[in-house]
Amino acid sequence: MDIIAKLRDVSFDELHPNERLKVDSHYLYGTLEESLADRATGAVSDADTQLTKFHGFYQQDDRDLRDDRRHRKLEPLYSFMVRLRLPGGRVSPEQWLTLDDNARRYANGTLRITTRQTFQYHGVFKENLRGHLQALDKAMMDTIAACGDVNRNVICTANPHRSPIHRQVHDLAHEISAHLLPRTRAYHEIFLGEERVAGGPREAEDEVEPLYTRHYLPRKFKVALAIPPENDVDVFAHDVGFIADVQAGELKGFNVCIGGGMGMTHGEPATFPRLSDIVGYCTPDRVVAVAEAIMLVQRDNGNRHDRKQARLKYTVEALGVDGFRQEVEARLGEALSPARELTLTHNGDRLGWYQGEDGLWHYGLFVQNGRLADSDGGPQLMTGMREIAQAHDGDIVLTTNQNLIITQVPEARREVIDDLLDRYRMTVEATPLRRHAMACVAFPTCGLAMAESERYLPSLIDRLDAIMREAGLADDAIIVRMTGCPNGCARPYLAEIGFVGKTIGRYNLYLGGGFAGERLNKLYRENIDEATILEELTPLIRRYAVEREPGEAFGDFVVRTGIIAPTLAGREFHA
C-alpha cells in the first residue's frame, strides 16, 4: 500500500507535527514569501524553519552572542546555513569563483567542505538569501534537497577524472540525484523569481511529486557509491550504498546495501547507529531503479509518528532485512542477484600529487576539518584556491573526508600549482593522525551542538600527536572523529577513536571502529573532560605500540585484546 492510501484514513493528530506541515505547505511553498518579506525579524516563521531545509538551508543563530543579545533585549542574531546540492562534489574553476565570491559577498567569508562532498555557507542573513541562491543558479548550481525529508546529496568515491570507472560511478551519482530530486517549482519561484504558471503546483494534485507525493519522506535519505578497495565514502553508513564490482577495468555492477545511518539520541537506547546490510547485486543500468525502489519502500513504510525512529535503518529493523529486500524486489518487478565478494581495505584520501590513467595529474589538498579560510600567519586557503581557480582549467573535486582535489593538471602546469600552494602556505605538514581526523561544525552556529567540535579538535589532536610520537607511532594513522552532539554528522561511530559531545568540555569516548569503515565502535567512557581523555588514551596507545600484530589497526587491536567488545549489529551498540 502506498503512502497516500495508507494515510488516507489516518488523523494527523496521530502523526508527528511535521507530517501535517509538509502536506499543508502545498509542495514546500508554505509562507516563505511572507517570511522573507518580513523585515522586522531576521528569522522566518516557525513552520517555515522546517520548509527551508527542503530548499537547502537551516535557520541558525550565533550562539557565542546569544546570552549577550538576550541581556540587551535583542532577538538572537539569526542567519542561515546554506548547503549546496553537488553530487559527486565536482565544480569547475568558473563555479569555484562564484562560490568564493558568494562567501565574501553573502556569508562569513569562509567555505566549509562537508562529509557529504559538498559546501556549506554560514552566516547568510535572510535578506541575502535570494541574491546568494540566484548567483549560484547563474553558475549552474543549486541547494535543492540538500536538507529535509528527501534524498540528500549523493556521494561517491572522489575524482571522476582518475579513471573511466571513476567517471562512470560519478555519472551514476548525478543520475540518482537528478532522478530523486523533488519536482515542485517552489524553490525556483520563491528564490529565483521564476513566474508562477496559473494552475501550477498550488492547485495541482499529487502528480506534482510523482515519487515523493505531498507527504515526502519520513526523514532524510542518503545514498553513497564506493569503488573498492577504497571506502572513502563510508559506504555502510548511509541509507543506501552501492559498492562497485570492477573486473579487468570494466564496471560490471554493484553490491546493494540498505539500512545504514549514524544518528542517535543520548540516553535513548532505542536509537542507535547502524551499518547497512548487503542485500544483493545489480547491473549499472539498474542502479537508479534500485535506488528509487528502496526510497519508495521507505516512503511507504517509514515511521511517521516518531522522528527519532523514522530513518530507513529503523524500517529495516522493523521489517527485517529479508522483508525489506522483498518489498524492494516487488517494486522492481525482479529479484536482486546474489551479492559478490568485494573487499574494502581502507578509508581516507589520497593527498599530494598522483597521476590518473590518462596521464594528467591530480593534487589532493588536506583541509583541516573542511574549513577554507584565510588565517592570520597560517594557510591562506580562500585566497589560494581563488588564485588556483583563476590559473587552472581543470575541475576541483571535494571529498567526503572534507578535503579537495585539484584535478586534470598537465605535467607542464604542475609547477604553477606548486608555486601557488607554496605562496599561500596551503601545504602545511600534517601527521597521519590529523589527516584522518574529522569534526562537525558544532559551535557557534549549529543549534544542536552540546560541545565544541571543529574549534576544539585541532588542539586535542596536538595532544594526541604528542602521545603518538612518544609511543613511536608518529607515522601511523588512527581514525579520530568528533561531533558536538550525537547526531553523527562526522560519522564518529565508525571511528577507531570517537568523541561525541555531552556538554561543554565533556565527551563520550568510543573505541573499536574498523579502519575500513566496516565496524561500529562502542562506548568506552562517558562524559569525560580532556584530562580524562588523555589519561584513558595514553596507556592504550602505548600498549598498541608494543603489543599490536603486524599491520593491525588500532580499532582491531582494542577489540582483539578485550579492551572493548565489538559492535556486531546496530541494535547491540549500547550493549
UniProtKB/Swiss-Prot annotation:
Binds 1 siroheme per subunit. Transmembrane segments: none annotated. It is an enzyme of class 1 (oxidoreductase). Its EC number is 1.8.1.2. InterPro entries: CysI (IPR011786), NiRdtase/SiRdtase_haem-b_fer (IPR005117), Nit/Sulf_reduc_fer-like_dom_sf (IPR036136), NO2/SO3_Rdtase_4Fe4S_dom (IPR006067), NO2/SO3_Rdtase_4Fe4S_prot (IPR045169), NO2/SO3_Rdtase_4Fe4S_sf (IPR045854), NO2/SO3_Rdtase_FeS/sirohaem_BS (IPR006066). One of its GO terms (molecular function) is metal ion binding. It comes from Chromohalobacter salexigens (strain ATCC BAA-138 / DSM 3043 / CIP 106854 / NCIMB 13768 / 1H11). Siroheme binds at residue 489. HAMAP family: CysI (MF_01540). Alpha(8)-beta(8). The alpha component is a flavoprotein, the beta component is a hemoprotein. [4Fe-4S] cluster binds at residues 440, 446, 485, 489. The gene is cysI. Pathway: Sulfur metabolism; hydrogen sulfide biosynthesis; hydrogen sulfide from sulfite (NADPH route): step 1/1. GO terms for biological process: cysteine biosynthetic process; hydrogen sulfide biosynthetic process; sulfate assimilation. It catalyses: hydrogen sulfide + 3 NADP(+) + 3 H2O = sulfite + 3 NADPH + 4 H(+). This is Sulfite reductase [NADPH] hemoprotein beta-component. GO terms for cellular component: sulfite reductase complex (NADPH). Belongs to the nitrite and sulfite reductase 4Fe-4S domain family. The keyword Heme applies.
